[in-house]
């Protein structure tokens, strides 16, 4: 299978339970909930999306003919340090492209594999860390994993709709944009009132890293 990658870069994970951890981010092109075109944003399941996932023209992006080639590019992006290799497959929606062949190839390079998914598609076996981020009314089929991270507030995706799912960690992440301060205040109060939930901030945006 060929893979279309918007961008490939090394940075620190900025969000959730793995915040602060060095990681290679492999951002796949494409999403099943929005085309990525501004003209279509109003009809998207997540009108608040702040990610460019269209095309393959980003840093380190491109079309990769097979799993081995993409795994080699991920390893090269990580660099010479052999320990604690960690790759995050994201998007767009990574489960449109992530398959068992690619998982096997990056595992063979010594990586722990994480995904950040909207949870609407079933994952292949072998993923080490599953983070689901529900979007609007889009039905979630991934009902167990390591981390559920909900952008908050969403009128069509309330925290109580997901609190019963089998995840180890539950995070509220204040929605970015002009009302971020108000959203943060709301998220803080919700976490205080519902201690099952923890606050996740996009620390990479605060410290100016990708």
UniProtKB/Swiss-Prot annotation:
Entry binding sites for Mg(2+): 51
GO molecular function, one term: carbon-nitrogen lyase activity
Record-annotated disulphide pairs: none
Amino acids binding [4Fe-4S] cluster: 31, 46, 49
Pathway(s) per entry: Purine metabolism; 7-cyano-7-deazaguanine biosynthesis
GO biological processes: queuosine biosynthetic process
NCBIfam families: queE_Cx14CxxC
Name under which the protein is recorded: 7-carboxy-7-deazaguanine synthase
Organism: Bordetella pertussis (strain Tohama I / ATCC BAA-589 / NCTC 13251)
Gene behind the chain: queE
């Amino acid at each position: 299978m060929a893979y279309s990658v918007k961008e490939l870069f090394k940075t620190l994970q900025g969000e959730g339970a793995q915040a602060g951890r060095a990681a290679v981010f492999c951002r796949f092109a494409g999403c099943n909930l929005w085309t990525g075109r501004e003209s279509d944003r109003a009809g998207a399941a997540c009108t608040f999306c702040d990610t460019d996932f269209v095309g393959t023209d980003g840093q380190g992006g491109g079309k990769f003919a097979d799993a081995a080639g993409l795994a080699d590019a991920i390893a090269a992006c990580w660099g010479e340090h052999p320990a604690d290799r960690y790759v995050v497959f994201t998007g767009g929606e990574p489960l449109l492209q992530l398959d068992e062949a690619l998982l096997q190839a990056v595992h063979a390079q010594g990586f722990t594999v994480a995904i950040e998914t909207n949870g609407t598609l079933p994952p292949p076996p072998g993923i080490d860390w599953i983070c689901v981020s529900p979007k609007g009314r889009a039905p979630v089929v991934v009902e167990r994993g390591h981390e559920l991270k909900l952008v908050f507030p969403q009128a069509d995706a309330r925290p109580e709709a997901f609190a019963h799912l089998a995840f180890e960690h539950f995070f509220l992440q204040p929605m970015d944009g002009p009302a971020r301060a108000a959203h943060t205040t709301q998220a803080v109060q919700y976490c205080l009132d519902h201690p099952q939930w923890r606050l996740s901030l996009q620390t990479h945006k605060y410290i100016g890293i990708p």
